[in-house]
Amino acid sequence: MSVQFIRGTAVADLEAPLIQATKQWLEEDAQHEVFYLVPNHIKFEQEIQVLQKLRQLQTTTSDSITSTRLQVFSFYRLAWYYLQHTPFYSADVLSDAGAAMIFRKILVEAEEELQIFRGEINKPGFIQQLFQLYQEMREGNIEIAELYPFLEKQTENPKGQDLQLKFQDLTLIFTRFQLQMSQYGYESAEIIQHLSEYLQTVDLSNVQFVISGYQQFTARELKLIEVLMAQAGSVKVALLLDKQYPHDLPDPRSLFYEAGQTYHQLYQLARQKQIPILSDYVEKKEVLITNPDLQGLNDYWIQSQEHLPPLSTADWRGDGLFLWRAENVKEELTHVATEIRRLVVEEGYRYKEIQVLTRDLDCYENLLEPIFAEHEIPVYVDRDMAMDRHPLVEWIESLFAIHSYNYRYRDVLRFLRTELFMPMNQLATSEESLTDWLNQRNAWRRKVDITENVVLAYGYEGYYWSQEKDWEFIRYDFEAEEQEDVATMEEESNAIRQSLQRLLPSYFQAMISAKTGLEAATVFYHFLLQSGVATQLKMWRLQAIEAGQLETARNHEQTWDALMSLLDEYVTVYGESSFDFTTFQEIFVSGLEGLHYSKVPTAIDQVQVRAMDLTRPGAAKVTFAIGMTEEIFPQKIENKTLLSDEERQTINDTLTENQYLRGTTGRKIAQEPYVAYLVFSSARERLYLTYPSVKDTAQEVKPSPYFKNIQKDLNLPVFEKNETTIFDDETTSLAHISTYRTLIGELTRLKRQRKETQEGLLPFWLNMEKALMNQSIAPLAKQVFESLTHQNIPEKIDEVLAEPLYGKDIYTSVSRMESFYRCQYQYFSRYGLRLKERDVFGLSPAATGEFFHEALDQFFKLLIMNQRNLSELTDQEVNLLAEEVLNSILGDARFSVLTTSSRMNYIRYQLSQTIKKVSWALKRQSQRSGMTTVQTEVLFGQIAAKKGISGLELPLKNQGKIHVRGKIDRIDQLVTPESTYLGVIDYKSSHRKFNMTEAYYGLAMQMLTYLDVALMDAVQLVGQEAKPAGSLYLHVHNPTLSYEGKDDIEQQMLKKYQFDGLLMKDPDLLDHLDTSLQAKQSSLLFPIEESAKEQIKPGRRQEDKFVTEPELGALLSHNRNKFIEAGNQIIGGEVQLNPAYQGKERIACRYCPFRSVCDFDVMLKENNYHRIENLSKEEIMARLLNKDEEGATEDE
């Protein structure tokens, strides 16, 4: 029975005397055993290290047997070793998630009794904070019931009263928690206590305990060590400590304060128990840190923190410590990877002998693995990965959301997209079945894709999913004016809907009907199996194993195991309680989100990446400490516990020597120099301290004060680590290259710089490129280098390919041709490649326009059919007629969207009001005008299965024709004694004016084409040849009127519905357009006015809207030529990226859905807008009238 302290600074190899003592103890007696106790996070590495060093010391065959009597454990593993067959381990120990359930249950039951913490159960993280405080108090050997009497006296000040009330709540919660936990098993803190009690009854005289890697212990761990010192044959305690503290505590500002305090505590415990204390062994011979510079850094840091005289830097060699400042985070990691690769290739290091330390893994994680992969460096990131990103967690969250929000479509799609809901026959895990499963999964995935499109297009939510009736829907193409075949879509989307409807409603009902937690857990478990979740995870695991992704396979297995454990613990805690579905959902969502995967390195020879706080002296031969900025080193520490620093200090002042709470925030901040000391001593041969000068969005990031102090006090250079430039010499350039894959990136950057600077590459780089092109990676390099000369210019399609794409004859509409002139690539994408955006539920502009057109068409057809004159109807008759039309249209399946929600019902009302207002205006217009409507919705050309009057058929250069189709909304006729005139009316749901420039450039071909067709087929339309009246727009809307307008309401309203467009400058026509006009008046219907001399003429500033017959003829001829020009370019394979730009408006790109396809970027010199020159009417007419036939199809 004895205890001995093994001391030394980080330079000393404290493990050497421990291994020697272990060997000696094992050799003394065949019954002797050794338990090596280390922190859990280094147990794996320490076990390998201890066994290796022990093997090196053994010299005979018999000696090698001694290692079987050596165990490397953590304290909790030691508890399992001794207590596994005792009642303490006979019951299942609840996990942290199970303990959180008990806390939740207590908080709900005791809510009315709580004062400070009432209602805190709904605060995110509160239960975790509560559990952490409980564990802290148990580990600190503190019974809360003992504290409360003292705290009752702390009522002199408000803070004392708050602390008393807080502990009143905590006493209630923790007392009930302990009572409940006694029914289920012992939590970890209790296990240590029971181990201490158990070991007092065990003969440990043949056992030596070696304790290493700790600097401080919890109160219960100290009690356990006290038992070990009293019972064991020998106890060795290794502490990173510069001197002994047998009688006095160290100065709180000391670098080794924590270790010194631990030394003092253990020394005093041994003295009190009269346990022999052997002389300290201070290691001075065996050196852990072998590089003299790093030894000097160790001494410097101790002296600077202990305020001792500074060191001399005269003997500094400069081969062990390197300070880097990188241009940014990416360059920092790139240079680290390059240096690692160099160390391995040139200096013989192994990857496992190198570690990367950081305190900001969130910043580096996304870049680290890809960059290291480029450099072909195997890496292991020692970080617990949360389960919250696993599809199973998403599946559970979306399942609960479906119930909470009644089949909201985004929740249903989230649920389906996890691909865990796949009800199918259970498959065996054989190679054949994996192929079968993949085929089934792909088929299911396709059905889900189709279902998603259907749901987005039709807005299926709520009862649409739970009803037994299958979905029935129509799909109407408003442009082509035809109904699409949706039989396959209906069948496949309904297959998905039926699967959900068969399982989900009954599951939710069963859960709601469950009486107890056990009953609900049983329902949930069976639903997991019925849904195919267990099978899917099993197949995912098998698929990952087949692909060699062992970590992914383990994650799938661990996630399922975690869910099953959570379910078991839920039954343990809530099994006999009344079931509450809301609590059940909260427990399982938060329970899985808080869990982490346990990780094991998948390969031995890997670079280790870990947190700075978890390192230890001499952990690796080479250490890269990255991200050494002032933001995180020293770390800014906040108190996020339930007790403030002041409250902690108050409590600590009342505790006995064997009780304590963890230190305050100030104490943790004071420990930061010690963390830095561990980082600086973590490397045995080389240490690299690096930081980025730019991080995220922060510019001019400052280095850590520790970094600056080392650089200044030791007079060390800071090496700049930047991107390669074309001006770098060969030595500097070589520092950027470690593999052929990285060479591709460097050469790409340099070639781009050469292009920008016109500087030549060094011969060194040309030789490197030549060597690269002889490697297997050459095809990738070639592809990347080609990107430097790539221009975002679409290739012209061969005419042989264009014909099967578009046909020999082109059947088109006016809007399609206008699209071609807006941007040829847009036309190619939509009508060549047939790309189309997914339909999204709602009333589209096309559907709105179709609604208005259909309503007005039926309105006039009823008038014509009933041989009624609109001008003769009363307002009431007009209103009744409009109502009849609306009732007919709103029952049409094309507009069923208008009945799907309250919002849509309101839109329906607004559309109806608009039609009624327009009907009112049409009546007033008919009373004032000589124009009468003779036909509506006049088809020309072939539209779907319908064939109308003759459309335009124009010749193309390939001997084919371009066939133009369309639908004229309305044709009006005006008959005078001298002539018959035809005019076309086009309804627009937005305000539109005829623009001569747009017509000239092919951007507005509709009105000229419609008028051309009407005149061409006049005999068929009105029974005789007719003269043109014009093409006019009618704005279909429900106008807002000015309250203070000088005109009366009717005049204001008619002004809002005034026709706008192109009119003939024909006196006979103008005299009869508005029969209500009087001298010195402007028409409310047309852009005309009557002069004082009773002469009808174009209105003020309206001249550009009027043309003569020769001018109209030129416009119509030019319009036809634009069709021919576009048709010839289309069949010729022209695909230019030339979006039109007029004035300050990007008319082609503004609403274009293909921007992500064409990648048009005005910053690229090869991408330019087709800028539309604004021309006056006179300029256009001069060009058209003076143009000879040879240039008739050319654009200026």
Curated annotation (Swiss-Prot):
Disulphides: none
EC number, as in UniProt: 3.1.-.-
Enzyme class: hydrolase
Cofactor note: Binds 1 [4Fe-4S] cluster.
Residues that, per the record, bind [4Fe-4S] cluster: C823, C1149, C1152, C1158
Residues that span the membrane, as ranges: none
Cofactor: Mg(2+); [4Fe-4S] cluster
Entry keyword Iron-sulfur: yes
Protein origin, superkingdom: Bacteria
Family from the record: Belongs to the helicase family. AddB/RexB type 2 subfamily.
Protein name: ATP-dependent helicase/deoxyribonuclease subunit B
Highest classification ranks of the organism: Bacteria, Bacillati, Bacillota, Bacilli, Lactobacillales
